[in-house]
């Protein structure tokens, strides 16, 4: 989108079924929006994972998303914690997998 804002789109049979917009700044990545057709949790998780991987490959270590701008899922599934109005996590922990994160 520009040099600090990026996005991923998920398509199925040529139809847009989801998108994730995120920005990078130093060691931080901020997920600005995640939208999916019908609130598909798996597509949302895949898009966020893609964004986090992209960010990590560009030296980002921490990620966050504004609680007021995104749905709770997939952030809780990926192990993000809610702090001061944001879902926050270090990227390596979020990318370790959703197994076990959703049950604490």
Task: Describe the predicted segments one by one.
Residues 25-39, 89:
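Conserved acetyl-CoA binding element of GNAT-fold acetyltransferases
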Residues 55-68:
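Conserved GNAT acetyl-CoA-binding A-motif
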Residues 81-99:
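Conserved catalytic-core motifs of GNAT/GCN5-like acyltransferases
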């Amino acid at each position: 989108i520009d040099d600090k804002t990026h996005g991923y789109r998920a398509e199925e049979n040529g139809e847009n079924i989801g998108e994730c917009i995120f920005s990078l700044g130093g060691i931080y990545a901020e997920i600005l929006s995640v939208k999916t057709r019908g609130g598909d949790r798996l597509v949302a998780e895949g898009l966020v994972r893609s964004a986090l991987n992209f960010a990590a490959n560009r030296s980002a270590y921490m990620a966050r998303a504004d609680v007021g701008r995104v749905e709770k899922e997939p952030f809780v599934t990926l192990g993000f914690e809610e702090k001061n109005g944001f879902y926050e996590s270090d990227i390596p922990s979020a990318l370790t997998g959703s197994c076990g994160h959703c049950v604490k």
